[in-house]
Amino acid sequence: MTLQAAAIIVAAGSSARMGFDKICASLAGRTVLEWSLQAFQDCADVSEIVLVCAAERLTEFQNLAAAFSKVRNVTPGGAQRSASVLNGLTILSANPPALVAVHDAARPLISASLVSRVLHAAKTHQAASAAQPVTDSLHRGEADGVLSETVSRQNLFAMQTPQAASFDLLWNALRAHPDVTDEVSALIASGIHPQAVVHNEPNFKITYPLDLQLAEILRNADYNNSAI
């Protein structure tokens, strides 16, 4: 069954760790943002997209998003992530969809099939997120970097995006818990337990210059199309 979900693409970050604008950085012939938008444009379960960006770049991003027919609105972001997502939800509130997916624009390797999997899991479980099991050994350290405790990685997942939930659940969770790093944190704090959608696709966030180089290699190899 095809869903009629909405997506909020968050592109309002500062790119401080990159040292340059990662959202509009060139990646395999397109920008990072365009690759993220394309996955949601191609997903049959997504009927509309709201793009959230820095206020001073509104016109630039409106022009870039014009090539994507599902982008219905480009709106300014807030001072923190939750405020940016709430701005997107406010746009959608005039005619709220049953489900909303939130995605970091800086994850340009996302595939339409993974978006669909997360949305269908959210429909079944109220909320869901793309996730991968933690595979590295984990140790807790002190302020000076001295390692003091081993942390079991059993049942630990690294959260990614998209993260999806019903409109009302997400709206209420973010309003009640604005100081969070992602939507899953707000939902859990509100007593909702999202489903982890475990996958093996490359879906890392562009954080450092090396990430962009790796994404370029994978995009040129057409990794997602061969993996789905």
Task: Please describe what each predicted stretch is.
Residues 203-228:
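Hydrophobic helical membrane-anchoring modules
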Residues 34-97:
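Conserved N-terminal catalytic core of the sugar/cofactor nucleotidyltransferase
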